[in-house]
Amino acid sequence: KNYLPEDQDIPRMQSLYGTNLIEKDHIQICFALAKVFKDLGQIKKSFDFLKEGNACQKRLLNYEISQDQKLFSRIRQAARHIQENTLKVSKKSSLPTPIFILGMPRSGTTLIEQIISSHTQVAGAGELEDIHFHGASLSIGDKKCSEKAIKEFRHIYLEKISKISQGSPYVTDKMPQNFLSIALICSAFPEAKIVHTKRLPAATCWSNFKEYFPNGLNYSFSLDDIIHYYSLYEDLMMFWNQYYKERIYHLNYESL
């Protein structure tokens, strides 16, 4: 919805902002008013509401960038053990082949999936949480990596996308933060395609800040944290490129 000056929702939201709301509701009103004043061309006012909403959410989460710095370090440490257990799979299979579209959140994965899944042989699955849900313990080294563990992970994931595929030989998974699990993806799915979407850093970071992510992207509520996280992401992608250069197709959003 684009707001106009005469929109009756605006005074209602402004009156709500001035009341004693619980913090979660106050945060949502801040983001809503940021959108209102952006549409009205009052950019400074919009930014002030964005800053307030993001700062409140960061306080609620008690997040520090050091949490993600440790996470990225553990991912690198676990990668070697995962790589040592890369599966060999038959090229002849009735199961669909995954196409992973990944990168920073807000980097264009949705558009890329729309383009790829418009092909008659591709089914679009959207953002699946299965790589994280079933594989995070392997990716960060919490669970001992073995060929058996990776086979079990592969089986669970392929069973899931088989139900979505509707007979299509390829299925896209556009969960952006699957970039954290590239070692596991390459070891469990040697046949998989990986598309890394990259957008201009300033556009990506700003888009993370202005969108309200209530779940999962704890770094996104501070511009400083976003910039640090973006640097961690770039370093990790360079690390993956050293080992999986032939597996990752890099696509610039601005080139589309």
PLM features per residue range, with description:
Residues 1-164:
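Alpha-helical solenoid repeat scaffolds of the TPR/TPR-like class and their adjacent stem/linker regions
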